[in-house]
Amino acid sequence: MKLQRQPFEAIRLEQKTIEMRLYDEKRRQIAVGDTITFRCEEEKLSVRVIALHRFPDFAALYAALPHSKLGSTDPKDMVQYYSQEEQRKYGVLGIEIERMTL
């Protein structure tokens, strides 16, 4: 999965442990125990999925999950990536992760 620099670094530093995505067809394939490789430019970072949190929209996700794990405190931040219409159509997913040790 591609990430912008700020969330990539927050995950690398273990300051962000829940990645938020639209619950589209691609994300429906994710299961607890899966490995996800995040990419930012040429860098890669592998994590393990430890929990999945489904919600109807990002407002509900932000209301239920600790902001300290999300890397952001405002659900409106996600509108730049996913419209309200997309959120209503698919729902959203909080992918709880842990860094993998080599």
List each language-model region with its residue ranges:
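Short, solvent-exposed secondary-structure boundary/capping segments
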Residues: H53-K69
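Short beta-strand-centered aromatic/proline hotspots
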Residues: K44-R54
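A mature extracytoplasmic/lumenal domain signature
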Residues: D24, A51-H53, R99-T101
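Compositionally biased, charged N-terminal/linker segments
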Residues: M1-Q29
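Glycine- and charge-enriched low-complexity intrinsically disordered segments
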Residues: L65-L102
